[in-house]
Amino acid sequence: LKIVVERDPIKTSFEKWAKPGHFSKTLAKGPNTTTWIWNLHADAHDFDSHTNDLEEISRKVFSAHFGQLAIIFIWLSGMYFHGARFSNYEAWLGDPTHIKPSAQVVWPIVGQEILNGDVGGGFRGIQITSGFFQIWRASGITSELQLYCTATGALIFAALMLFAGWFHYHKAAPKLAWFQDVESMLNHHLAGLLGLGSLGWAGHQVHVSLPINQLLDAGVDPKEIPLPHEFISNRDLLAQLYPSFAEGLTPFFTLNWSEYSDFLTFRGGLNPVTGGLWLTDTAHHHLAIAILFLIAGHMYRTNWGIGHNLKEILEAHKGPFTGEGHRGLYEILTTSWHAQLALNLAMLGSLTIVVAHHMYSMPPYPYLAIDYGTQLSLFTHHMWIGGFLIVGAAAHAAIFMVRDYDPTTQYNNLLDRVLRHRDAIVSHLNWACIFLGFHSFGLYIHNDTMSALGRPQDMFSDTAIQLQPIFAQWIQNTHASSPSLTAPDATASTSLTWGGGDLVAVGAKVALLPIPLGTADFLVHHIHAFTIHVTVLILLKGVLFARSSRLIPDKVNLGFRFPCDGPGRGGTCQVSAWDHVFLGLFWMYNAISVVIFHFSWKMQSDVWGSISDQGVVTHITGGNFAQSSITINGWLRDFLWAQASQVIQSYGSSLSAYGLFFLGAHFVWAFSLMFLFSGRGYWQELIESIVWAHNKLKVAPAIQPRALSIVQGRAVGVA
């Protein structure tokens, strides 16, 4: 393989920066109306609309990725700098069970210093819930100087990324063939990014994180612990903690790998000192992952005539009922970056949601499990990100269908067959949504009615008519008992949540315990099923009907985003692929709201809490989930109001910012909803009256004000 680049393809110039809209003939003329600024933002990064040249589009996307990485490094640098300059990290490291993490101190300008609460150890600041302190501890960072160094390093990397973005667009831009060489890309991404990346992290964990955390767990003062480079350069230091280090690489080359089991463990469960996963387990995990991906990165055919070829694999992939199978999909995925992105977003979004569920059930960092605010924040964060990525997958799949799909080259393959029986798919999915909606809400309505009539014996509950989630309980039991069969050396199952084990408490707070599932979980689970299926229905319908429908057969000519099919065609609004993304987003919000509510209440009721010297656990909401969450009234009274009222009453305390955010978020919600409900004509009439008044006073603007278009109003409304 030869890496083909074009030298000096585009001159470096800042002239275009002074010409807003330079990428479009229409926009480059400048603004006539206020719509111009909307179109400027909508199209600035829509590289497809700037040119039809796939090579140029690919180069722009590639270059933009380096810009994105630079922003990430700058953001990370800021986080580490705050840790170094404004935080109580060293104090927290010394006493993580009594001192809360803080990395921001508010300046006293007009009384905002009220926000600086006492986080323990005499430090006043805003408590942070990002989990950075815990990940720094797991990395082996023991001083604020190390945070300064890392922050500086991140800025240097940001500069390198910015340089790379410029270099690979202006100086040495890859040819299209390079972007389309999937075998080489797979080898490099699998072996390089994932394989060597995991190996590097495993190496850092073994040589730096493990010894430092071992000493911290034993109560050694962070200032007494040797510096990271001393562990790397002085093997004797490591050998004192992990005796197998004294033997060097001999066990590795003699295949006596079990010698290394003092620092590459397979224990399961949590470290009772920190309430986090055993870091020796995670080091072992990353080493294993590295080996797998290094092997995977050598599976695809490039310079030598061995290995897999993606096109051959796809075209051989045929079943007895699938026509041409995957024939034609290789061409789609190497010429449509929207199609490629749609698949990647769907997988990454699903993975992010899996991460959300593992962060609490298998807390990876020390003391993360007893920092309940951080646990809640990390769960919420990963659910939201996952939701956005999955909706983005549908958006780009629909853009692919409108802009890149060529029906003449896709005959009777799987994509064509899916499109041809889209009516069956959508109508079946619609039936599933109706079934789930009526039945899941019906169970709640039944319970509310029986509760109102004073007939608790007729309710669906753990103490009356039981609807136990028997399959979920079976999975829990299987996982709880499996280590004795599948991993005889493991001392516990993968997660305490499966059951079987005792609770782990750190600093008189519950880190984790077996999570019981009952009728209440069965009910809310079916609400999850309902909201997820409706989200999928809307998004999938948008993709399958992006090019045409019975209502608008020529939809593809109208594009990805249009308000209605012109005047005289009533009932054709909110029908574009873009509108399906818009409506799908609302249902994604619905879906994750119920998930976050369920998680928040369940954990406070059945897991989180304090433990007395006698071993008695007192949960935050006293175990009220099983009986209260089985009615809609219970959700409103014992969760939404019970929790919100505490936030609303936070004014005048260091928590008042949360009360103000809570209030502000509802204002934003109401304000954005206004854009969905109000008609465009109403605003245009109002604007014209105001412009008339300005004309009277001879202060009329040169750029004519224009009411938001229907699509623009929806964009504001959904945000």
Curated annotation (Swiss-Prot):
Membership in a protein family: Belongs to the PsaA/PsaB family.
GO cellular component terms, semicolon-separated: chloroplast thylakoid membrane; photosystem I
Binding residues for chlorophyll a: 674, 682
Enzyme Commission numbers on file: 1.97.1.12
GO BP term, pick one: photosynthesis
Membrane topology: Multi-pass membrane protein
UniProt keyword S-adenosyl-L-methionine present: no
Name the record gives this protein: Photosystem I P700 chlorophyll a apoprotein A1
Keyword tRNA-binding attached: no
GN (gene name): psaA
Enzyme class: oxidoreductase
